């Protein structure tokens, strides 16, 4: 029997996984060799240098110490570079193994994803859209919370196929164009995994924009605080060098009083920006991957990514700036460092001022970027599903040309996507005309309920933009 397209895809992925595992094993051997070299250079350098110093050959000893130090640092640099690449390779291998498990419906090796159906949803539970072995668990390979919510919305609201502003035909075209771009999908997923295994949380980023910084005349306050800290340092040095009275206590008291008066407005901000730079780094890495990509044959992808790829100034520049500001404010997580910095300069006020300016500039653009990433992420999840199942077909919308044509549903060889191919039974279906129905009969355990679920779950997939 001639292998199908899915069989060939499965064999190709298996060969790729085995080749990657061999590369990983070779890298592990090389890493062990680097460790031995580092240990050997350290021990040899210590023994030879100490012996030379004991002979009072200090200049020779200094030269040898420098040579061994340079050699050790060089080997360490190459070793660290290798370990970084091995870590990247390990994450990439996990992505490929997860995809292979989804192709084989190997549920124990599929990454677990939790989805909850909307309350009183008419068909989500009956059609196995949610649950541990559900359709969403199978197709959800998203890297962002917005993408995860969007792909679920496309399935839950398949009876409202334009609920997110994109028609289901546009979604299908987008998914079609993304299907062959497996390298782009893997790069975006890998970019976020290198930073954290947790999904990119767009809601946290949006919350930073929605809450305004309510400090009047912030720029003037920052200037005054800088003047007070500078005056405190100058007067403190004057007192230290000349023994003058402690006049530095006066500007310091005013500065501390100003800080505590504003702490009520600043404190809620820390809860939103603490560790937010990690989420921004994920967003930057994904957008940077898109900025480096070209889409010569994907006009729909270009249209969806228009807000990111057609900006005069690259979004990554603004987001990196915002990430550095959030890192600066996250110093509050280290109390001693935070106290020392604010004693020397108005650290918090300075970064709050910079944050206020950046937020004002990104208040409109950043939600659009996140929305674009969410749409692309959700479509990429369906595209990965289509890539893993090349035998599946893309549904087509029927168009009536005469008044005698009746609208309906036609399917040939329709099977349940959650049943393994070896055990899957396919059926044909044709239902036309308003008010018409099909009566499904059969004995117990003959597959009547499975057939009805097959029709329903494939309708959800089709209207979400995926193949069936």
Please identify what each model-predicted range represents.
Residues 427-468:
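P-loop NTPase nucleotide-binding module
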Residues 2-436:
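Alpha-helical bundle segments enriched in helix-capping/polar residues
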């Amino acid at each position: 029997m001639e292998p199908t397209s899915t069989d060939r895809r499965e064999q190709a992925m298996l060969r790729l996984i085995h080749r990657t595992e061999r590369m990983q094993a070779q890298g592990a051997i090389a890493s062990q060799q680097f460790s031995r070299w580092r240990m050997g250079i350290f021990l040899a350098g210590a023994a030879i240098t100490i012996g030379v110093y004991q002979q009072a050959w200090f200049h020779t000893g200094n030269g040898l110490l420098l040579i061994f130090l340079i050699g050790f640092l060089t080997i360490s640099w190459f070793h660290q570079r290798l370990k970084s690449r091995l870590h990247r390779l390990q994450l990439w291998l996990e992505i490929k193994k997860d995809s292979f498990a989804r192709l084989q419906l190997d549920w124990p090796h599929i990454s677990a994803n939790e989805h909850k159906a909307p309350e009183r949803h008419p068909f989500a539970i009956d059609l196995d859209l949610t649950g541990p072995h559900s359709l969403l668990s199978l197709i959800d390979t998203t890297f962002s919370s917005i993408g995860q919510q969007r792909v679920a919305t496309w399935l839950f609201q398949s009876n409202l196929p334009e609920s997110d502003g994109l028609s289901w035909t546009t979604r299908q075209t987008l998914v079609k164009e993304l299907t062959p771009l497996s390298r782009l999908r893997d790069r975006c997923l890998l970019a976020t995994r290198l930073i954290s295994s947790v999904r990119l949380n767009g809601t946290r980023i949006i919350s930073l924009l929605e809450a305004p910084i309510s400090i009047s005349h912030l720029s003037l306050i920052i200037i005054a605080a800088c003047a007070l800290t500078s005056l405190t340092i100058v007067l403190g040095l004057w007192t230290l060098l000349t023994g003058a009275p402690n006049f530095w206590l006066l500007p310091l008291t005013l500065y501390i009083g100003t800080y505590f008066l504003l702490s009520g407005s600043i404190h809620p901000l820390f809860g939103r920006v603490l560790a937010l730079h990690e989420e921004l780094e994920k967003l930057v890495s994904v957008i940077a991957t898109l900025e480096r990509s070209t889409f010569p044959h994907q006009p729909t992808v270009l249209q969806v990514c228009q807000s990111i790829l057609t900006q005069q100034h690259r979004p990554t520049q603004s987001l990196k700036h915002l990430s550095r500001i959030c890192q600066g404010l996250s110093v509050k997580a280290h109390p001693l460092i935070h106290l020392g910095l604010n004693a020397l300069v108005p650290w918090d006020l300075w970064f709050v001022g910079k944050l206020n300016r950046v937020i004002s500039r990104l208040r409109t653009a950043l939600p659009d970027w996140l929305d674009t990433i969410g749409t692309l992420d959700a479509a990429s999840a369906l595209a990965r599903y289509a890539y893993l199942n090349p035998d599946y077909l893309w549904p087509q919308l029927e168009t009536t040309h005469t008044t005698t044509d009746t609208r309906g549903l036609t399917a040939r060889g329709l099977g349940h996507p959650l049943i393994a191919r070896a055990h899957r039974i396919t059926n044909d279906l044709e239902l036309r005309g308003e008010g018409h129905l099909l009566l499904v009969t059969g004995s117990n355990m003959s597959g009547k309920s499975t057939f009805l679920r097959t029709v329903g779950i494939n309708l959800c997939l089709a209207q979400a933009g995926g193949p069936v």
